[in-house]
Amino acid sequence: MEPLLRIPFLKRTVFKSMTDITYTGRRSGKRVTLPIVFERRGDDQVVVGVAMADRKTWWRNFASGPEPIGIRLDGVDRTGTGVAKVGDKGTAVVITLDPLP
């Protein structure tokens, strides 16, 4: 999926709310990159909904509190911290972005 996300026309149209996140696995210690669909909340927050959370494990890396995460937004690699939120409306990872230098 990543190469498709880098094609400018597709990025602006079809994949407007898709990008990649990168984090280090809590147990494995391995760097993981995966495509996600996101929603921006202001300038400093991004929400990643987790569909069928009971069948996925990646979001659990953020369940015990803020953990470092990378995300590519508007062609810029950003860093921040992610926290998993589980509620009546489902599961999401809320990313608070670090300020730009």
Roles of regions detected by a PLM:
Residues 5-8, 27, 36, 63:
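Solvent-exposed, flexible loop/coil residues
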Residues 16-51:
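Short beta-strand segments
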Residues 42-45, 52-101:
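Short, structured beta-strand-loop surface elements
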Residues 1-18:
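Alpha-helical membrane-targeting segments
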Residues 7, 21, 36, 69-71, ...:
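Weak global preference for isoleucine
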